[in-house]
Amino acid sequence: MHLTPRELDKLMIYCLAEVAHKRKAQGIKLNHPESVAVISAAALDGARAGKTVEDVMKDAATVLTRDDVMEGVPEMIPLVQVEAVFTDGSRLVTVHSPIQ
């Protein structure tokens, strides 16, 4: 199987997001890379599901709370940007203050 660099990036995001979801389900607080992966995967999934850019940004900002992550992580992530493929093409999705 041959994957483009972009496809490899998405695969890494999804793999780390799956690990993070398992840890979250076990009650383990997420670190910085895990948190970014979960937020990015939520944005990619929303775009793939046919949502608008605005809906994807709004939904991705609600997937994690301060209780889900280690201390200091929300301050380390002022925004998350990911290029997602929507029904009308690729767009850069920016999620501001993704951890409330």
Swiss-Prot record:
Top EC class for this record: hydrolase
EC number: 3.5.1.5
Superkingdom classification of source: Bacteria
Compartments, record wording: Cytoplasm
Predominant cellular place of this UniProt entry's protein: cytoplasm
Keywords: Cytoplasm, Hydrolase
Quaternary structure, from the entry: Heterotrimer of UreA (gamma), UreB (beta) and UreC (alpha) subunits. Three heterotrimers associate to form the active enzyme.
Protein name per Swiss-Prot or TrEMBL: Urease subunit gamma
Organism this protein belongs to: Laribacter hongkongensis (strain HLHK9)
Lineage of producing organism: Bacteria, Pseudomonadati, Pseudomonadota, Betaproteobacteria, Neisseriales
